Amino acid sequence: MTSKIFSPKISAVIESLRKLPTIGKKSSQRLALYLLDKSPETAIAIANSLLDATANIKKCVYCQALTEDDVCNICSNTNRDDTKLCIIESMLDMIAIEEAGIYRGKYFVLNGRISPLDGIGPSELKLNILQQIIADRKIDEVILAISPTVEGETTAHFISQMIVKDIKISRIGFGVPFGGELEYLDQQTLLHAFNARTNI
């Protein structure tokens, strides 16, 4: 019914916005109409910034976080603790941990979890790069800050078995419920989770 209301170009904008996480039909319609009718200059600015970013953003050669340079700000920061490596699912987890101010080591961003049903295996998560980093660096602790979902448990187990080097492997714990996503935890809960991490 709504397809008869909107022109093809407006419908195309709505459908594009619907592809974004957490954006449903109504939200995509509201956003599209706002951008096209009330604030076309904002629409142009967003489009230009996205075009510029997609042309220039890449993944850090070490941690796999998004960056404009070959090495991201955290990996190139000599004040960070090189002996600690925190393995996370996404940059949103990195943001949550950094904002909580509870960790000063380095990261490795998986950009997902092992999920055979979705066609995501170790190679998609660049675990070969992670393995090389662990082999090359003087790391004394690997912290698995992975959400306790079924896929997260599978991923954490695979990584812990993959590490043959004699180093401490820990998992954040207290306050993270099964099925919970790390990025949604408040700072106090994250602090408890890091302080109560257990050895694997």
UniProtKB/Swiss-Prot annotation:
SMART domains (UniProt xref):
TOPRIM
- Any one Pfam family here would be Toprim_4
- Leader sequence range is none
Q: Name one GO molecular function term.
A: DNA binding
The answer to keyword Nucleotide-binding applying to this record is no
CDD domains xref list: TOPRIM_recR
Q: Which gene encodes it?
A: recR
- The molecule here is called Recombination protein RecR
